[in-house]
Every structure is written in structure tokens, then in C-alpha cells.
Amino acid sequence: MPRIVIVEEDKLMRDLLTEWLSAEGYSVRAVANGNVQGQDKADLVIVDVYMPRRQGSNRLREIQAANPQTPFIAISGQFRPGLAGSCTAARALGVRQVIAKPFSRRELIAAVHDVIGPAH
């Protein structure tokens, strides 16, 4: 079963993403603070790159250092569809997909399938 780690400060969003991805058959671990350790080996990390308490790009680099081979999907309310600069900056940090909030379950699942494939 593919493992996904979600890094998101907002509890409601963490819970919603966990529910959506678990229903698709993924094993999900959600954390609020971005402290993703070596024991959190994952097939994918979904990270909110804008959090008020931490600089998103710095946190992304820290998580990547702990999980160097793991692909990332970045989510944020700061991205705007069609805003090339945000996508370019995120991809320069090694992010495979960028999703602007608010997004639908369908959009999230499509991005996850694109990066790691379906759970079954």
C-alpha cells in the first residue's frame, strides 16, 4: 500500500486530505509541523508550502533532506492557477505537482495518481 505523508498546519485540511486519500486506498500519516523524520518513509509527501509559522521553502528543503528520493506535491492558498512564477519556483525546489487551494478531491487524486499511481 503506497504511503503518503501530509504536512499541513490546518487540522481540518489535514483531516480532509487524510479522509480523501485513505478512501482511495493509500496509507496516510498527517503531521502539523513538518517534522518528517527518517521513520516516516513515504512514497509521496504532500506539503502546504505556505504556513504562517514557518518559511515554506525552508521547510520543504528540510523535509527533502530527510526524504531525498521522495516526490512532493505542493499545496497552498498562495498559488493562483495560471501564475507561472509560483509553479516555476516550486518546481525549482523539486516539487512534482503544484495545487492551488481551494481544490477538489478529484484534483488532488489526479495529482497523486500522476506522481505515484493509484493505490491498487
Specify the residue positions occupied by each region the protein language model found:
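Hydrophobic/aromatic residues positioned on beta-strands within the core alpha/beta folds
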Residues: 73-78
